[in-house]
Curated annotation (Swiss-Prot):
This is Putative TrmH family tRNA/rRNA methyltransferase. It comes from Staphylococcus saprophyticus subsp. saprophyticus (strain ATCC 15305 / DSM 20229 / NCIMB 8711 / NCTC 7292 / S-41). InterPro entries: Alpha/beta_knot_MTases, Ribosomal_eL30-like_sf, rRNA_MeTrfase_TrmH, SpoU_MeTrfase, SpoU_subst-bd, tRNA_m1G_MTases_N. Transmembrane segments: none annotated. Belongs to the class IV-like SAM-binding methyltransferase superfamily. RNA methyltransferase TrmH family. GO terms for molecular function: RNA binding; RNA methyltransferase activity. One of its GO terms (cellular component) is cytosol. Its EC number is 2.1.1.-. One of its GO terms (biological process) is RNA processing. NCBIfam families: rRNA_methyl_3. Keywords: Methyltransferase, Transferase. S-adenosyl-L-methionine binds at G196, I216, L225. CDD domains: SpoU-like_RlmB.
Length: 249
């Protein structure tokens, strides 16, 4: 059976809680049980195999800090796009989906998933080509958010955007030229927010599908932001516009 490895106490705990299929948990043999008591209880109640191993064993599984905990899990499953759209239409809320056009850095994707979960974004769309997939590096960087945010992997991003538009979404692209300050963005309708790659920005076909463009003003010496930072600003601007202070999102 194909499987991948995740490391870190929080990532492993979130995988158990979310119901993800876990084949085995590895615990560093020098870790005191009191430090991982919650994980051990969850593993026991879910009948998950737990194996005590030397630190070198876990070191060999990942270059990331692992806190003495790792797990072999089933591959991450991508959400079905058509089912996602139908589900969003059935809900009485303004939907937001993030569209990542050519993002290739797994740490950026993990960070974006983390912020998407925190800010109430409903789903993330990535293309099958020219894009990072859901890997253990993404899982680690997301600190467990990968278990909670639907990620859809599509063949044709431009066609997918057209389907979103047919279902009431307005598509907003991040673009420096001929665009509006993101603080003036209207968030009163279902939104698809496009984040282009750091090197190339949005592809031509995707850019042509956008309904309007926004920019993030910068007054310092640099002229660009990390993709995950730009995405975070956009997501929380939508959150700010839709949620008054003191209201529960």
């Amino acid at each position: 059976m194909e499987e991948i490895v995740i490391v870190g106490r929080h990532a492993v705990k979130e995988a158990i809680v979310s119901g993800h299929t876990i084949n085995k948990i590895l615990i560093q043999d020098t870790i005191k049980k009191g430090q991982i008591n919650e994980i051990l209880k969850l593993a026991n109640s879910n009948k998950i195999i737990v194996q005590s191993v030397p630190k070198s064993k876990i070191d060999g599984l990942s270059d990331s800090p692992h806190q003495g905990v790792a797990a072999y899990i089933a591959p991450y499953e991508y959400a079905d796009f058509d089912a996602f759209v139908a589900q969003q239409k059935a809900q009485d809320k303004l939907s937001t989906v993030l569209i990542l056009d050519g993002l290739e850095d797994p740490h950026n994707l993990g960070s974006i998933l983390r912020t998407a979960d925190a800010s109430g974004v409903d789903g993330v769309i990535i293309p099958k080509r020219r894009s990072v997939a859901l890997t253990q590096t993404v899982a680690k960087a997301s600190t467990g958010a990968i278990q909670h945010i639907p990620v859809m992997r599509v063949t044709n991003l431009a066609n997918t955007i057209e389907t979103l538009k047919d279902n009431g979404y307005w598509i907003v692209g991040t673009e420096a030229e001929n665009s509006t300050d993101y603080r003036e963005m209207d968030a009163g309708m279902p939104l698809g927010i496009v984040i282009g790659s750091e090197g190339q920005g949005m592809s031509r076909l995707v850019k042509e599908k956008c309904d309007f463009y926004i920019n993030i003003p910068m007054v310092g010496h640099v002229n660009s932001l990390n993709a995950s930072v730009a995405a975070s600003l956009m997501m929380y601007e939508v959150f700010r516009k839709r949620n008054y202070i003191g209201d529960k999102a």
